[in-house]
Amino acid sequence: APDLITKLNHNLPFAINPPAIDNDYPQSRIFAVFQFMTKEVFIVAAARTPMGSFNGALSSVPATQLGAIAIKGALEKAGIDPNLVNEVFMGCVLQAGVGQAPARQASKFAGIGDHVPATTINKVCASGLKSVALGAQSIMLGLNDIVVAGGMENMSLTPHYLPNSRTGYRYGHVQALDGIVQDGLTDAYDKSLMGTCAELCAKEMNFSREEQDNYAIQSYT
């Protein structure tokens, strides 16, 4: 173990001080605690597309293209060359019909090179913010210097599903599942709708509708 500590200290930019070994317990081992000096993280620019209505003016634009527009806009505002981006995290919940690797598509359409890792995050409503958190953490740990993080969605292009189409339909009516309801707005366990969850949260936290509306207005003013 001392040789291992010496070797690690030789190769790492910080020293490891091993804790004392409890000789009363033969199974005890040395546990090295790595203390990283984390970097500060800054959001240097942000961009978004207009918030379109359902089946509105932007309804025919795929989520990946919307994401690309926002990525390109943010990079231009920050004055950052797309080739300097180290990694991309993009949230996307309704991925059916979008195509493989949505984050990769948005990244590529925005002019970021194929050599840059791009990861799609699905944490339902928190997908975009989780992407930002993952990007920040990667910078804090020294894994990246420049990260693109955000979210993209087009509910209007989300398809309906025919679950039994591969085995064939015979006699009778065929029921289609709405991809928005199935994968985006329904709890997978108790089948409650997300709108219900929002109402319960507002009631529990004592948020009035006026307060919610005023907060929402801040996002586009």
Q: Where are the regions a protein language model picked out?
A:
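Intrinsically disordered, low-complexity serine/threonine-rich segments
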Residues: 17, 31-34, 85, 128
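Short, positively charged and aromatic/hydrophobic N-terminal segments
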Residues: 13, 20-33
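Acyl-thioester C-C bond-transforming condensing/cleaving domain
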Residues: 38-39, 53-84, 96-101, 107-221
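Intrinsically disordered, low-complexity polar regions and short flexible loop motifs
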Residues: 44
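Short hydrophobic targeting helices and cationic amphipathic motifs
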Residues: 4, 10-12
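Short glycine-rich phosphate-binding loop at a beta-alpha junction
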Residues: 86-91
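Short polar catalytic/cofactor-binding loops
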Residues: 47-51
